[in-house]
């Protein structure tokens, strides 16, 4: 809401400065084209994560995202007003005021966002929070709360029931051993919300102690739900089969799945048709750059564990008939700055242009635009052995992009894929058309930054 106000205030100031006074009739002539432009700007801000509390901090990450968004917004403004014919609707050309509007907006927007981040990060009104119980997820959650004060929680203490207390972890947080005098401890620290780990619920005595605290206006939430809300992933160590029975409903998603299939088909058909113009150029550069076929064919695991074939533009040096590069090394996950990639292949992978042929897989229904990554059978066998509930990723179709790819990127180890499965399960539980659009928009941001591998 604040951004919208700043947009229109900057327009009013620009027109006032330009015409030496505010004229409502002039404002009316500008309102339609600039409103269209501002809608595009807001989408650009969203793509660059400027509405995520995770980066609502005055640091380099936020500044770089803000600068990129403003540059792209400015360039699109120039295209709209100077290149697209008739965009100014004829009567008066708002493009004469565009530069002034952009300058005023940048100053106001930059100041407003930095003030917002400062206020949110330093607000004294935070929820005093305690974690009851101690496990790896509790530690990760504690680190997340400490690192992101703008989320609105102040972690006061952790209470755990272990004989030994490792002070190398979370040295800045008060850690209390044992659950004796639980109510008095929470009241003394003025805790208003307690996050409870699954282990605590195994003790009937502890449950009674927690129950006795309710009358003192202390709210209790389980670690799994709070962890999910803060990190946007599902903690594998805190769930079991019952979690899937309670949270993963296929029946309630039937209308969504039908609409998603229609959306996938038409969007993939349009993009594939448009991209065909570039295929001959891409194919020629691939052939000139290195020996081997233009396309690379590979088997992947799809919905329900069913194998299917994907086709990609070859981006690596080929040493087998399928365009692969693993004849000598065997199956190997892609890694950052992969030495197997050709010079042009690095560009294809950075921009994800190597995946253009996979639009056909979306059209025929093997894939979707959004979903878990389709893994190779060789890696699938290893990962499902080491990662709990790994196969549950295949409850839905794999995607060209996905929540795990957005939040974590590529994973080249079991530990990486453990993290990605947690994001995949979050998506499967919360998937919706709006969520899909959000992921698609954020994928565009990754492509613009050359974030492929």
Region spans (language model):
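N-terminal hydrophobic signal-anchor/signal peptide
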Residues: 1-6, 56-58, 111-276
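Signature of alpha-helical transmembrane segments in polytopic membrane proteins
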Residues: 1-124, 153, 453
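Alpha-helical bilayer-embedded segments of polytopic membrane proteins, i.e.
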Residues: 1-9, 35-36, 67-72, 103, ...
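Membrane-cytosol interface motif
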Residues: 66, 70, 125-143, 293-316
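Short, glycine-rich, amphipathic interfacial segments at transmembrane boundaries or analogous
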Residues: 164-166, 224-228, 234-237, 295-340, ...
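A hydrophobic, helix-centered structural microdomain
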Residues: 256-321, 361, 433, 438-453
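A short, structured surface patch at a secondary-structure boundary
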Residues: 334-397, 439-447
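C-terminal terminal-structure detector
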Residues: 342, 364, 385-453
């Amino acid at each position: 809401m604040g951004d919208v106000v700043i947009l229109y205030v900057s327009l009013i100031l620009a027109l006032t400065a330009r015409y030496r006074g505010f004229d409502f009739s002039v404002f009316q002539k500008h309102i339609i084209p600039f409103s269209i432009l501002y809608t595009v700007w807001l989408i650009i801000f969203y793509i660059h994560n400027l509405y995520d509390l995770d980066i609502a901090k005055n640091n380099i990450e936020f500044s770089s995202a803000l600068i990129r968004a403003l540059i792209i917004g400015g360039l699109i403004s120039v295209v709209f007003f100077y290149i697209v014919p008739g965009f100014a609707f004829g009567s008066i050309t708002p493009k004469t005021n565009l530069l002034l509007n952009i300058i005023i907006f940048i100053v106001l927007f930059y100041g407003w966002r930095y003030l917002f981040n400062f206020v949110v990060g330093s607000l004294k009104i935070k929820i005093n929070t305690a974690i009851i119980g101690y496990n790896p997820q509790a530690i990760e959650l504690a680190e997340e709360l400490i690192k992101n004060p703008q989320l609105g929680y102040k972690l006061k203490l952790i209470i755990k029931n272990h004989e030994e207390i490792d002070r190398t972890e979370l040295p800045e947080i008060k850690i209390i051993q044992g659950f004796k005098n639980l109510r008095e401890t929470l009241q003394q620290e003025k805790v208003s919300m307690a996050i409870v780990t699954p282990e605590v619920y195994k003790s009937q005595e502890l449950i009674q102690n927690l129950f006795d605290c309710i009358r003192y206006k202390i709210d209790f939430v389980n670690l799994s739900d709070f962890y999910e809300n803060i990190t946007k992933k599902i903690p594998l160590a805190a769930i079991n089969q019952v979690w899937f029975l309670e949270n993963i409903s296929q029946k309630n998603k039937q209308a969504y799945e039908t609409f998603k299939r229609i959306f996938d088909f038409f969007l993939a058909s349009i993009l594939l048709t448009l991209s065909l113009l570039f295929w001959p150029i891409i194919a020629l550069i691939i052939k000139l750059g290195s020996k081997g076929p233009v396309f690379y064919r590979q088997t992947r695991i799809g919905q329900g564990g069913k194998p299917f074939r994907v086709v990609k533009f070859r981006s690596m040096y080929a040493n087998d008939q399928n365009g692969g590069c693993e004849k000598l090394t065997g199956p190997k996950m892609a890694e950052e700055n992969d030495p197997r990639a050709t010079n042009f292949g690095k560009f294809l992978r950075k921009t994800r242009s190597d995946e253009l042929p996979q639009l056909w897989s979306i059209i025929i229904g093997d894939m979707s635009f959004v979903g878990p990554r389709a893994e190779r059978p060789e890696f699938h066998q290893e990962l499902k052995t080491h990662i709990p509930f790994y196969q549950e990723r295949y409850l839905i179709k794999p995607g060209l992009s996905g929540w795990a790819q957005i939040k974590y990127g590529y994973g080249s180890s079991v530990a990486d894929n453990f993290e990605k499965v947690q994001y995949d399960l979050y998506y499967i539980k919360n998937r919706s058309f709006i969520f899909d659009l959000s992921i698609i928009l954020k994928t565009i941001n990754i492509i613009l930054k050359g974030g492929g591998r």
